[in-house]
Amino acid sequence: MTVSPSALAELGFNYQEEDSVRPWAAVLVDLPQNEGVYTYAIPPGLTVQDGDIVAVPFGNQQLGGIVVGCLTKLPPDLPPEKIKPIQDVIVSGFFAPHYWRLLHWLAEYYCTELITVIRMALPPGLLQRSQRRIKLNGDRLPSDWPLFLSQPSHQGARQILTLLQSSKEGDYSYRYLRQKVPGLTKALRDLLKRQWVESYLEPPKAVQPQLPKMVTLLNFDPSFKLTELQARTLIVLKNQGGEMWLADLLKAVPCSASTIQSLAKKGLVAIAEREKLRLFQQPSINASQAPELTPAQKQACQTVLPLQGYHQVLLHGVTGSGKTEVYLQICGDRLGKGQSVLVLVPEIGLTPQLTDRFRARFGNKVAVYHSGLSSGEKYDTWRQTLLGHEQIVIGTRSAIFTPLPNLGLIILDEEHDSSFKQTQLTPNYHARTVAQRRAELEQCPLILGSATPSLESWHTVHRHQNDPQRHYLELPERVQSRPLPPVQIVDMRAELKQGNRSIFSRALQTALGELKAKQQQGILFINRRGHSTFVSCRSCGYVLECPNCDVSLSYHYVQGNGQPLLRCHYCNHAEIQPKVCPECSSPYLKFFGSGTQKVTEALTQEFPDLRWIRFDSDTTRRKGAHRALLDQFQRGEADLLVGTQMLTKGLDLAQITLVGVVAADSLLNFADYRSAERGFQTLTQVSGRAGRGEEPGQVIIQTYTPRHPVIQAVKTHNYHGFIAQELPQREMLNYPPYGKLILLRCLGTNEREVEKTIQAIAVLCEQLLPKTVEILGPAPASILRIAQRYRWQLLVKYPSFIKVILPLERIKQICPSSVYLDIDVDPLSID
């Protein structure tokens, strides 16, 4: 039976009716590449409210949708007979009112569809497609049906009924029957017409709760006649508090399931299914006590603890100043008041260390949420947050959407970090911006912590320094009065002139040589993974490039007997390293630039006694790899961590005394207005990993531009001096934090069509946007082609004190189906 979709609801129609009887609902239907709000009838006896997740018929399928409003009157020109009923409510009241408002705001602010925001915010599995199933209608099936279908023309129908009768439930999926029965469609149509079978759509299923069996001790009576195995089973169960998961009990005794069943028949134990949350498994942590606070830490806590309602706090503390302890003190206060806390970190690699410290203080009240979890673990973490108990969730940017009850505090640690901005998927949201809006809606304080605050956060709090809801708190010294590590700048031009061809300067070589003797550990930071930045022919100059992108391929060394690879870091294309030049067949190929693999190769050659661990996105892809590598390092199984940006983000390893920056210039030479800020933040953060323990630290930065303003600011740990130089340049050009930016980018396989589309969008924006808005471009992106798609863009720039609303519907009408439009509000990069 084909069911036509309900008529499309009228755009702009008011769905927020206040009458008590509201027989229709506007449902945002989950359709691929489309956001459709459709009107459905609410069946008698079914309670539906805004934010419910419902199953609705749409054509010949059943889809998931979100109720966005209920109404007493139909939109004009919408006949009641066309309205189909909602099938069922999958999750009732899933969105709290303030959460619902957050999603609406996010869709509007980031210029995207509400359904896109909902798909991103929900855990996996809540809006999945249903499947069609065929069920035997036993009441209508005549007993002599085999005789009736004995004709050869009825062979398909006979096969269907035979299969259905062999099924315990009397039904199979349409997909399964199609595989088993040739010519299924005609035979099934015949059976449906006779009403011997039914066709139905199984409601969309969320990721299901895990329901293993729990064994509970009911009676421990020695007078019962028991076998030795049964008695031992009861003793094990009693010693474990009277309750154990069945699987655990079978291993602990050990015994078989029949032994447990026999005890249940005697009435000594009960066996029942019980939900077991698939929370991320973490090692046990010893409890810790709060240390003595420094005067600055005490002042910070005294300022934040009394805050009620929305407040924004910028906690600016130098590396090693004890920001995390301030977080812990304030979190303890919030938990004591029955409130929950959300803690966001920029990288998965940071969650193990931070989680361990929180769990040592707060035990099992701490949960984690990030992209490294399985779908089941994500789903169950959401379920745990909905139970209503006060708790702490620690996670990466996606954790901002966890529905914590009675939220009392949001913390963004390392708030300056670019990883808080989503750039690979729509919407291109920034977790800091969303956190600010969520804190406003839920009326709780927001703490932004960093040793190198973003210029936006710094400017906001100082521009509103008389606002009682804005607070600037500073931790200017390290705990226990430990000094910041001295920073030595090495001019690599001088090294080359004096005959040093190594990637390590003589100063760094000396420090590395002393590391083993002093039984200390260190970090080597390089801004690129892989071995070499590009491969070029020394005979003809040919550079090996990606066939899909306008970029060179990076050389990656493969361990063991594997062949060396050339890999694209944009589309992940990989090919075997050729032995001769593809252009002129010359065997003289040269590798240029350095990555983490090349650094470790040089270490092995020059310092064979030093043990190292590579810590980059190539070595941490596997689940749990971040923790495993850091634990290995903390146990003293390596002398050096060699890695990329991950090493700069809040790692607190007391045994590190040396930090070496192999090539600082790779952070500075970008055609982007944020280049200096990012370079200063990265170099300052990685420098701050040294000297956090009892032993003093040292930092060696290798560069070809030692007089660069960023290098000089990092040398003296001078954040205030850096921003005093950087902010006037931003203000002069009206770049953030003084101006606002929106990047519109068109992508497609036909370059001329992409260019033509972005030019038409630019003309439209010039016509419709206020004169105070500046349109820069259109122009090709700095990398014109990625993954075989050409990229053209324009930048909308305007003063931060005005509000600009893009003519989205008009812009979308300009874009043909072959051109994808990406809108990035507040872009962190305009390349």
UniProtKB/Swiss-Prot annotation:
Residues 575-735 form the Helicase C-terminal domain. It catalyses: Couples ATP hydrolysis with the unwinding of duplex DNA by translocating in the 3'-5' direction; ATP + H2O = ADP + phosphate + H(+). It comes from the Bacteria. Residues 304-471 form the Helicase ATP-binding domain. One of its GO terms (biological process) is DNA replication. The keyword DNA repair does not apply. Its cofactor is Zn(2+). Zn(2+) 2 binds at C546, C549, C568, C571. It holds the Pfam family PriA_3primeBD. InterPro entries: DEAD/DEAH_box_helicase_dom, Helicase_ATP-bd, Helicase_C-like, P-loop_NTPase, PriA, PriA_3primeBD, PriA_3primeBD_sf, PriA_C. GO terms for molecular function: 3'-5' DNA helicase activity; ATP binding; ATP hydrolysis activity; DNA binding; zinc ion binding. One of its GO terms (cellular component) is primosome complex. ATP binds at G317, V318, T319, G320, S321, G322, K323, T324. Keywords: ATP-binding, DNA replication, DNA-binding, Helicase, Hydrolase, Isomerase, Metal-binding, Nucleotide-binding, Primosome, Zinc. Its EC number is 5.6.2.4. CDD domains: DEXHc_priA, SF2_C_priA. Zn(2+) 1 binds at C537, C540, C581, C584. Binds 2 zinc ions per subunit. A motif (DEAH box) lies at residues 413-416. Component of the replication restart primosome. Belongs to the helicase family. PriA subfamily. Initiates the restart of stalled replication forks, which reloads the replicative helicase on sites other than the origin of replication. Recognizes and binds to abandoned replication forks and remodels them to uncover a helicase loading site. Promotes assembly of the primosome at these replication forks. This is Replication restart protein PriA. It comes from Synechocystis sp. (strain ATCC 27184 / PCC 6803 / Kazusa). The lineage of its organism: Bacteria, Bacillati, Cyanobacteriota, Cyanophyceae, Synechococcales.
